[in-house]
Amino acid sequence: MVLTTNLYSLNLRSTFFFTNTITCPTLFTFKLSSVSNPRRVFPNIRAHVSAASSNSELESLLSTDRKLISKQSNNGASSISSGVRLENISKSYEGITVLKDVTWEVKKGEKVGLIGVNGAGKTTQLRIITGQEEPDSGNVIWAKPNLKVAFLSQEFEVSMGKTVKEEFMCTFKEEMEIARKLENLQKAIEEAVDDLELMGKLLDEFDLLQRRAQEVDLDSIHAKISKLMSELGFVSEDADRLVASFSSGWQMRMSLGKILLQNPDLLLLDEPTNHLDLDTIEWLEGYLIKQDVPMVIISHDRAFLDQLCTKIVETEMGVSRTFDGNYSQYVISKAELVEAQYAAWEKQQKEIEATKDLISRLSAGANSGRASSAEKKLEKLQEEELIEKPFQRKQMKIRFPECGLSGRSVVTVKNLVFGFDDKMLFNKANLAIERGEKVAIIGPNGCGKSTLLKLIMGLEKPMRGEVILGEHNVLPNYFEQNQAEAQDLDKTVIETVVEAAVDWRIDDIKALLGRCNFKADMLDRKVSLLSGGEKARLAFCKFMVKPSTLLVLDEPTNHLDIPSKEMLEEAINEYKGTVITVSHDRYFIKQIVNRVIEVRDGGLMDYAGDYNYFLEKNVEARARELEREAELEEKAPKVKAKSKMSKAEREARKKQKMKAFQASKKKSKSSKNAKRWN
């Protein structure tokens, strides 16, 4: 294993990678320009100062500063993008090969989508790049030393007890350390008036630190944070709010923001869209598209991969293969490659069979020489020139068990009013969903999408209005976001699914579990021993086997790989019942829905068409609304608002004005006649 020396990595909790972790300093305001370099004027005053208590602190301050400057002096600018190459990487766990001679690279301007089924070794490759794991063999080759690497893992972490601004400030560990030391040096210089030698050393350190502060642009930190907070959707008032008061989606924005603030040389993203709403995903796409920094993105969000990636690296059965273009181009190229390889394999198999047949016919008598020649040809075909049959994952078809047809009316929402103490979510909202409709509920995080599903399921009660399930044979099957944590921890994996299944053969249940990446040795494992992702996949399997006429799904694709998503999409399209889903996966929504409901401004905006129809009409509606507002504002008279008057008051005022007008006319006429006769 060869790693370029002096690799400078970053580790912001789970967000960044640091070789030496520094405790996040206490937030304080420090402006470099406000700190003047103390003049080297030494007054002729002898002050008796006890240095015993401060000597060790000063020595520590001086030595630390020297180390800090020394450590950073050789760093390249973080704006200079570079790349990394994995060369013949192999990795095994407990005798099971996960990666086998994996080779690929990412360079400046490239955005690599790393894809594969769950457990294929995608995250392992990122961990090898960052040095968190060592490969069994192979090399990681860096294009330059001191490369700054940012890594957003699936399990992001933020400090719940900090404010939003404090959380972002923790990104600037070195800068805050410099600011703290500058402040301490300023105080030390003021106290060292009787020690010329010490003051000289302190001033030298101050000069070094001040230059370093200018290099890291210490003055701009607050402006950078404010700008990015705005881009991420935070308002200025959010800066002093606790991180704990935000939803997981907003906490993910904080983690992303901490990465983006560092301007890394290499950006590694592991499922970055998992907790983001559609608006934020589109913002993130727009932001990342503009960056030249090399990126490696693990994602099962096919629309995200389509928008961003310049090439796709597929890991299958431990082997990697690189395809130019985005995800859609990969799908086409992969199909063509498999087809061509299968045709070549089939042709070679026919040649092998024909050669074997020739050998058997020539083996006897005078043709033994020709038979020997044919045997050599066969040996060469089978050993040196053998074409492997292309691997094709077995496509398992799943169907949701159905219980006949429901009545025409499935869900009715009438004048719904609902909210929480600090926020009203729905204000006289109305909705009617009928049998056979497949509906997507969309909107920004926190607008009430999941709450609407809970109201439909009867898990929440309206403040006013009503939410009614149809009377005839409406049998809902509900998949909620935290369903993974609501399972019986004492049951085994197989017991959990068998309990929910009706009329399923045990072999079919095992096949379903296998398709969701539960190996045979995991079937008897207790649920309590599963990871978060494994619990989520188990909850999905349990959901798939329950009979119903109405599917209610809250972010069902969050922990699914692409083949599992395709399996779910096919099952939903074959389902004759009604489907209501909350999802931020645009590709998934496009495949399954025929109606879109947008939660906006306390109401439910209805788009009677698929997701493309919603995009078309939504843009037009927003544009028309803006045009109307601009037109009304332009035509509106620039006067103060009139006070409210009754009809009788308005009539009286009108008569009064008319009398005043008539009197004014008479007065004007008399005045003119008087002037005329004078």
Swiss-Prot record:
Residues that coordinate or bind ATP: 116-123, 443-450
Residue ranges that the Swiss-Prot or TrEMBL entry lists as coiled coil: none
Basic residues composition bias: residue spans: 653-678
Record-annotated ABC transporter domain positions: 84-342, 411-626
The keyword Repeat is annotated on this UniProt entry: yes
GO molecular function per UniProt: ATP binding; ATP hydrolysis activity; mRNA binding
Region (Disordered): 630-678
Keyword Hydrolase: no
PROSITE patterns assigned: ABC_TRANSPORTER_1, ABC_TRANSPORTER_2
Keywords: ATP-binding, Nucleotide-binding, Repeat, Transport
Stored Pfam families: ABC_tran, ABC_tran_Xtn
Source superkingdom: Eukaryota
Protein family: Belongs to the ABC transporter superfamily. ABCF family. EF3 (TC 3.A.1.121) subfamily.
Protein name: ABC transporter F family member 2
Annotated organism of origin: Arabidopsis thaliana (Mouse-ear cress)
